[in-house]
């Protein structure tokens, strides 16, 4: 099972024994099944979920035709989730936050928040340089390595250097559903999850 949701922020709840539990508040608006794929017709089993409202003027004609063929209202996000067995969903079916029960263990997949071009201190938690005694190497990358054998003058691939931070696919596993609020379409998940639009499975 899987469902799409949007992270609203962090909060905290008290357990019955008095423990304070930090939680991520996930808004799970109704998900609509946009397509169902099977081994017989597509070569694999999958279900395509639609999430979020969107105006038709923002859609291309091929995407608009896909919604018209399925007989569903246009949605902003479409995500496909592969299944091991033949799906039991039907096109147009609606999924809500209550597909996961309290105490259930889940995985969360999404794109982490992009933070732009960052240096090695922020990106890789490197140490700062000396702050005084004439040093000008405060936040620089510093040495990329001593002379290498075989000619030197090169930088090994994978060297920790400045670059794009965030904005990549992230999977966080074994999170626990602490509470489900079906009246407000909210799901509270133990510990922080780093994405805005999340696929909960």
Where are these regions (language model features)?
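Single conserved hydrophobic/aromatic residue that forms the stacking wall/gate
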Residues: 190-193, 197-201
């Amino acid at each position: 099972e899987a469902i799409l949701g949007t992270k609203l922020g962090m909060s905290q709840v008290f357990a019955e024994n008095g423990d304070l539990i930090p939680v991520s508040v996930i808004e799970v608006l109704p998900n609509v099944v946009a397509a169902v794929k099977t081994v017989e017709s597509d070569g694999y089993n999958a279900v395509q979920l639609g999430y979020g409202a969107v105006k038709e003027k923002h859609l291309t004609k091929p995407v608009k035709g896909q919604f018209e063929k399925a007989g569903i209202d246009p949605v902003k996000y479409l995500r496909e989730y592969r299944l091991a067995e033949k799906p039991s969903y039907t096109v147009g079916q609606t999924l809500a936050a209550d597909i996961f029960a309290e105490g259930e263990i889940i995985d969360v997949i999404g794109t982490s928040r992009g933070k732009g071009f960052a240096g090695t201190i922020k990106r890789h938690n490197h140490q700062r340089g000396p702050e005084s005694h004439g040093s000008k190497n405060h936040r620089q990358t510093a040495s990329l390595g001593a002379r290498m054998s075989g000619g030197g003058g090169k930088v090994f691939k994978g060297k920790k250097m400045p670059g794009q931070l965030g904005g990549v696919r992230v999977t966080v596993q074994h999170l626990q559903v602490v509470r489900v609020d079906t009246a407000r379409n909210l799901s509270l998940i133990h510990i922080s999850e780093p994405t805005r639009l999340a696929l909960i499975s």
